[in-house]
């Protein structure tokens, strides 16, 4: 992420004590950077210093500040700047001085190594392993690339390496990482803990494994650089003193033409250190000499102060009205402070300079959106000496665009974009409005504006195929432009249906999705809020069901495999899990326009990333790890998860201690629901695909549900509700797709534990008794369909004749209803089939009903398996023989639980039942409010008192439940005729029923 410009800046630094001079100044300042990256991959503001004199200047105890009342806000370290050289300082707020990189293990270092012909001792990765019988050789290891110090025989499948190293002070280490050049795969460990791997499966892979994903060519011998792996949690992995780096290098097969393993291990120290060696230039560790202030820069009316060691202000520059990506600094011609469009860190400031930036903004007389009829648009906001230039096609205005002189007639759908120009000034920010004339929509509306060439240019448009011959000729047309990770600038306007609420943002736009990029003419899009476009986030409540309204990105999805069918399958299935532990993307159907052209209906969705998860769970997004498929990294690293999978693969989870460890790492409650849901859905584009899971230091591993288009069976299979997805998800030897062995491993191993098995079965049963009940799912299908139905006809009319469709759609309503009805058929039939799959898989003979009754819901409620809160006076569910269920009585405030009655009797609030027949159980609660019974214990009379009540009806029960007496309209009871013991009084007033225990002495 650190580019050539910032490397040049490092060359200007000197770390010697030198003469103090004054010929250094602020040279260039950027308050909204999006082009240059720091060592973390971020794009913070920056300040550039320039030594315009002829002496080296030491900057120790010089200061930068954005506050005149606190000129010593950030002090520079002991660092010097050479004559005619530049120093870039990130104004990020990270407050970093110097760090010191050292390479602990270098190329050409000696290792103990082994080329095995049998599986090595499993302890070979640990420090105390005896490697006396291993060979001794220099790195690199391999053959045929002419860069191998230790040449191994041609056709070698694997080589095992061990190298000891020392760490003196763990607290002085800022970070540590492995750089490694490899052909074709490797796994690396420190002190027995996996720290990195690439291109190979298995936990651990066998010594002769050829389960390498694909050929991977080494880089160094052909002028490239090794791949870097940052080691997370190094404080828990490393020892002070001796450590061991162990690497298992793999070839793709014995016929491979070459093999390479060249490792480097480097550490970044907080203080100068003599440990290790000066880093090899190929590692590019100069980036760790970067400096960061403890403040950021405002783009509006803020001065930056530069003071020398005596506290004297050497220079001061006002930052005011800078647009994203522009800078302020000194002119090379006049030596005056000017503005620049092109920033030049490490070089002379640009010769294209401007007096300043136009601060005025264009105002539109009419807000964009859906309009009933044509309108005359007025643009205003300019002052004397300025002109407004505008475009009508979505492109950004430039110096050749139309000059606004009179009202603009808007009689067709269009996008107007305008900005103010003034001679010698950078033009103002662009303002955009989109107008749709004469259309009507009953859902929210999204209007997109961008230069048409950004999307549709035959050569470079992100929506197009690209030049002929540049892509694979069959679906999904790999290599086409729409498969590239290209981002274009644009503008969006969002209008809420039946509301005046709207939102407008500048944005970046990409093509989004998988197979549907090439399969569907309507391509999915993703939108990004970035500082370089002016909007660092999308602040708007796009989704009614979310409590938060701050987004860094979102997507509009074309419905994937369900496009031009029901168009609701994925949003229906994922939203069915609303209110559960499952993380999923909320949705909102939107009528969409691109540059005024109707582009059909999309499903607006949250974008799965660390920001979505942070918003849902109130954690720090920067600390989140997200993995996909076979532990591929989306964010963070996979070391911790791979170690967990390694443990799971090599240990018996029927052992309670092993299972307890795994359950301490995985959110078992969430995982059982995730598995049960995908199995019920019959999602057969899973589990070997469409899986994402995540972790934060404060959480366990959790799974995300997304892209469920294959759920409820693919559209071509009408009897898919019969398919046994439970067996499918436990398959030991599935093919490469959709259920390869790695994808079923976790579930297969967990199900061996009886506690997990019972929890999974009960969670599946809980959902079948509630969320997945046929009537509930059918109602949900129709409810979701009702949200898109108003737009369906328009959407299909827009796309039904597109060349990507491949079939005729004659009657749109009938066509869509066919696919909606298919889902209804699935919902009505899957329920009973799913129960049969459970009984078949786990050899369960039968299931039975349990009826829970609660005559007064105001007194308390019943909870089943810690999942279902029963809020009705009579509830029935079905559960399986030999799988105990937990039933808990929970009294409301002012009440207490009395006892269970019916087909069983118990005074315990929690009961565990193995159903071997149908049961009917009543929960009984008693009132413990202001009613008083006294004296208690008593030998003769008991009085009943409640404020405002004169008399009560009373039934006296023995401890066995036998009625010992009934009285009407009394406020005292004579109990002298009762034998000594404990009794329960059922006391009924005009408004309440109370239960009170009394003791007859």
Q: What name fits each language-model region?
A:
Residues 99-124, 284-345, 505-517, 789-795:
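Conserved beta-structured recognition patch
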Residues 316, 327, 336-341, 345-353, ...:
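Middle-to-C-terminal accessory/interaction subdomains
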Residues 111, 134, 157, 165, ...:
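Aromatic-lined ligand-binding clefts that engage carbohydrates, nucleic acids, or primary amines
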Residues 448, 466-636:
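Conserved ATP-binding subdomain of kinase catalytic cores across diverse folds
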Residues 99-174, 201-230:
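Extended carbohydrate-recognition surfaces in non-catalytic/accessory domains of CAZymes
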Residues 895, 929-934, 938-1001:
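C-terminal outer-membrane/trafficking sorting elements
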Residues 20-68, 99-101, 166-182, 271-302, ...:
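A structural motif detector for short, solvent-exposed N-terminal "entry" segments of globular domains
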Residues 80-83, 87-90, 269-284, 301, ...:
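Short, compositionally stereotyped local motifs that mark structural "simplifiers"
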């Amino acid at each position: 992420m650190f580019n050539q410009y910032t490397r040049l800046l490092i060359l200007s630094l000197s770390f010697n004590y030198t003469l103090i001079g004054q010929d250094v100044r602020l040279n260039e300042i950027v308050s909204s950077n999006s082009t240059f990256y720091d060592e973390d991959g971020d794009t913070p503001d920056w300040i550039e210093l320039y030594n315009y004199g002829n002496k080296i200047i030491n900057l120790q105890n010089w200061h930068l500040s954005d506050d005149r009342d606190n000129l010593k806000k950030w002090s520079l370290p002991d660092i010097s700047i050479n004559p005619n050289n530049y120093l870039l300082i990130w104004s990020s707020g990270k407050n970093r001085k110097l760090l010191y990189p050292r390479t602990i293990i270098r190329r050409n270092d000696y290792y103990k190594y082994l080329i095995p012909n049998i599986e090595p001792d499993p302890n070979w990765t640990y420090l105390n392993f005896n490697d006396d019988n291993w060979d001794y050789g220099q790195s690199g290891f391999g053959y045929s690339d002419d860069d191998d110090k230790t040449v191994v025989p041609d056709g070698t499948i694997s080589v095992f390496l061990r190298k000891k190293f020392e760490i003196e002070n763990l607290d002085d280490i800022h970070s540590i990482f492995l750089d490694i050049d490899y052909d074709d795969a490797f796994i690396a460990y420190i002190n027995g803990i996996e720290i990195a791997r690439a291109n190979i499966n298995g936990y651990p892979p066998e010594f002769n494994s050829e389960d390498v994903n694909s050929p991977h060519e080494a880089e160094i011998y052909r002028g490239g650089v090794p791949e870097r792996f940052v080691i997370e949690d190094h404080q828990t992995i490393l020892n002070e003193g001796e450590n061991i780096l162990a690497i298992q290098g793999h070839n793709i097969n014995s016929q491979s033409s070459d093999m390479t393993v060249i490792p480097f291990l480097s550490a970044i120290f907080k203080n100068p250190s003599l440990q290790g060696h000066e880093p090899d230039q190929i590692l590019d560790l100069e980036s760790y000499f970067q400096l960061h202030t403890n403040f950021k820069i405002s783009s509006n009316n803020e001065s930056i102060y530069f003071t020398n060691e005596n506290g004297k202000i050497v220079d001061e520059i006002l930052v005011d009205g800078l647009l994203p990506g522009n800078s302020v600094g000194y002119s090379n011609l006049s030596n005056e402070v000017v503005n620049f469009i092109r920033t030049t860190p490490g070089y002379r400031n640009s010769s294209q300079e401007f007096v300043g930036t136009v601060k005025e903004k264009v105002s539109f007389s009419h807000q964009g959106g859906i309009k009933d009829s044509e309108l005359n648009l007025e643009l205003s906001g300019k002052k004397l000496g300025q002109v407004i230039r505008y475009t009508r096609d979505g492109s950004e205005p430039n110096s050749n665009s139309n000059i606004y002189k009179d009202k603009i007639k808007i009689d067709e759908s269009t996008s107007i974009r305008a900005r103010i120009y003034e001679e010698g000034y950078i033009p103002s920010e662009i303002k955009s409005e989109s107008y749709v004339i004469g259309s009507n929509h009953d859902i929210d509306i999204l209007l997109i504006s961008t230069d048409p060439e950004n999307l549709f240019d035959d050569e470079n448009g992100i929506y197009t195929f690209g030049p002929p011959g540049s892509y694979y000729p069959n679906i999904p047309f790999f290599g086409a432009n729409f498969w590239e990770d290209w981002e274009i600038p644009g503008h969006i306007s969002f209008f809420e249906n039946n509301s005046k609420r709207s939102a407008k943002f500048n944005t970046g736009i990409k093509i989004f999705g998988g197979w549907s990029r090439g399969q569907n003419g309507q391509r999915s899009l993703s939108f990004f809020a970035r500082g370089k476009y002016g909007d660092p986030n999308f602040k708007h409540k796009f989704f009614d069901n979310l409590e938060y309204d701050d987004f860094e990105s979102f997507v509009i999805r074309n419905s994937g495999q369900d496009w031009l069918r029901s168009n609701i399958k994925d949003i229906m299935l994922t939203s069915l899990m609303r209110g559960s532990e499952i993380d999923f993307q909320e949705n909102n159907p939107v009528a969409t326009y691109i540059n005024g052209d109707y582009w059909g209906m999309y499903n607006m969705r949250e974008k799965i990333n660390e920001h979505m998860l942070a918003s849902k769970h109130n954690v720090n997004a920067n600390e989140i790890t997200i993995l996909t498929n076979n532990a591929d990294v989306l964010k963070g690293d996979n070391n911790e998860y791979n170690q967990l999978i390694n443990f799971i693969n090599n240990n018996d989870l029927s052992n309670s201690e092993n299972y307890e460890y795994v359950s301490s790492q995985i959110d078992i409650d969430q995982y059982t629901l995730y598995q049960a849901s995908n199995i019920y859905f019959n999602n057969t584009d899973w589990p070997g695909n469409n899986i994402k899971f995540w972790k934060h230091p404060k959480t366990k591993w959790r799974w995300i549900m997304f892209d469920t288009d294959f759920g409820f069976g693919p559209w071509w299979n009408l009897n898919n509700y019969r398919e046994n997805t439970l067996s499918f998800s436990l398959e030991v030897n599935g093919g490469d797709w959709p259920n390869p062995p790695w994808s079923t491993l976790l579930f297969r191993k967990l199900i061996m534990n009886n506690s997990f098995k019972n929890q999974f079965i009960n969670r599946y049963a809980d959902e079948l008794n509630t969320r997945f009940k046929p009537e509930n799912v059918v109602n949900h299908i129709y409810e979701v369909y009702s949200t898109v139905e108003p737009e369906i006809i328009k959407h299909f009319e827009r796309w039904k004749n597109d060349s990507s469709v491949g079939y005729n759609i004659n009657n749109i309503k009938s066509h869509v209803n066919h696919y909606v009805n298919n889902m209804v058929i699935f919902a009505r039939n899957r329920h009973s089939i799913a129960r049969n799959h459970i009984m078949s898989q786990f050899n369960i003979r039968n299931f039975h009903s349990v009826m829970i009754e609660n005559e007064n819901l105001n007194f308390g409620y019943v909870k089943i398996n810690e999942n279902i809160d029963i809020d009705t006076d009579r509830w029935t569910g079905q559960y399986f023989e030999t799988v105990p269920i937990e039933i808990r009585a929970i009294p409301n405030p002012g009440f207490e639980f009395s006892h269970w009655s019916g087909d069983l009797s118990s005074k315990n609030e929690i009961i565990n039942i193995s159903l071997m027949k149908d049961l009917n159980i009543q929960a009984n609660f008693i009132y413990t409010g202001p009613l008083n019974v006294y004296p208690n214990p008593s030998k003769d009379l008991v009085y009943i008192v409640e404020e405002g009540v004169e008399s009560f009806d009373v039934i006296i029960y023995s401890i066995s439940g036998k009625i010992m007496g009934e009285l009407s309209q009394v406020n005292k009871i004579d109990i002298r005729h009762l034998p000594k013991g404990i009794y329960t009084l059922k006391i009924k007033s005009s408004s309440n029923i109370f239960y009170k225990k009394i003791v007859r002495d």
